[in-house]
Amino acid sequence: MAGSLPHHSLRELARRHGPIMRLQLGEILTIVISSADMVKEILGKNELAFAQRPEIAAVEVMSYENSSFVYSPYGEYWKEMRKICMLELLSMKRVLSFRSIREEECWNMIKTIQSSQGKPANLSKIVLNLINDVTSRAAFGEKCKYRDEFLSFLEEVTLLAGGFELPDLFPSIWFLRYLSRMKPALERLHKKIDVILDHIVAEHEEKLKGNRGNNEEKNAREDLVDVLLNLQKSSETNYFIKPHVIKNIVMELFCAGSDTSSTTTVWAFSEMVRNPRVMEKAQAEVRAVLKGKTQVREQDIQGLEYLKLVVKETLRMHSPGPLMARESREACTINGYEIPKKTKIVINTYAVGRDPEFWSDPESFVPERFLNSSVDFRGSSFEYIPFGGGRRICPGINFGIANIELPLAQLLYHFDWSLADGVKAQDLDMSETFGITSRRKTPLIMVAEPCVPFSYDGDHDK
């Protein structure tokens, strides 16, 4: 399955062999889960037994001294990092503090699209740059001067950290990491990123020295690196927050924040283009709720109920991570099957989100299916787990959703859209690639026609 679309291949196997399968993938005993009932066994009844992630070769190379928060073993270090992320870095209060950044960067995106003057625009790239700029300003306090280097790093990691490369399937054969060119390539890229992160952290340390005693200024301008440096000075957390840990957390937040939000936003727009009825309904709602305003503000999003359904349906059909990996911390029994300790568990979220047992007409994009539904993406609905579940559920849900909804509202409000080169909606290529996330295989090329007059009053601090 390496090099193909493993989530598709595994779904086809599950159709023939059932929702729980035992596979021998190279040296790795793997249990594949493809239904909500089986997900409940893993992320519900036996969640603590599966609170571990398996080792991935690419992550070993890119993390600092095995300090990855996302992939670290379940234990005291992971618990402390999780608490820091939930309470300090990605809390709702912190996410709301970045509201002006999202609004300003969305406005920059609108100006970029307007400047295309009716020519075809690469919406995939425009959205990726937008989310990259939002994430870098939230993390570093300013747009990243090293955007190209970070995006190159993000591209490589996304492709290689899916867990289906040869070094992951045959971990005892160490030289495969070199034959596959994975390790040398990532090491070179990581060295470049390390120099950049050292520079960013050093700049923030100097800035914090200059702001000592000025708490009002500090709180107004505090970004995620500032938060981590302040935590480093705390007696309660300094044991965990070492310099290399700060760099690793920033790198992982940057990669996760940029990739998942941009991928989901582009898929949402692609599905609306492919389904004109949905596009028209979402666009009509945005324009009715805003009633001729010249700018979409984040507080306006609360009234866009149909847009929220579009995002939910996108996450069902295009889960940010199509395959979710866990590892058994102890021997246990699942649905009558004995699962040995250190068995790799792969939950096919792609298959679960399209399971006809739980979803009517699962291959069709129908946002209305979530009307008056209690199904939610925060981990309690096992048929719908785009952000995972249990202790390992994604801590950045609030940050991610905020970075998806506002750009979509802006794009729908200010422009009417058509595909380039006369391509019809039903002919839009919806092929995907495989990696940590599942992106479009080809960029989404669109032609924008300005519709609603827009202006920006510049009332936010830069």
Where are these regions (language model features)?
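Conserved cytochrome P450 K-helix/beta-meander segment immediately N-terminal to the heme-binding cysteine loop
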Residues: 301, 325, 347-375
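Cytochrome P450 heme-thiolate monooxygenase catalytic core
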Residues: 54-62, 96-265, 281, 298-299
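Cytochrome P450 heme-thiolate "Cys pocket" and heme-binding signature region
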Residues: 251, 373-404, 429-433
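C-terminal helix/juxtamembrane-tail motif
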Residues: 436-462
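Cytochrome P450 heme-binding "Cys pocket" and the immediately downstream C-terminal segment
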Residues: 145, 276-278, 397-437
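Classical protein tyrosine phosphatase
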Residues: 32-42, 48-51, 138-150, 258-284, ...
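Conserved cytochrome P450 K-helix E-x-x-R motif and the immediately C-terminal K′/meander segment
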Residues: 1-18, 195, 276, 297-337, ...
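Cytochrome P450 substrate-recognition site 1
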Residues: 1-97, 101, 122, 127-134, ...
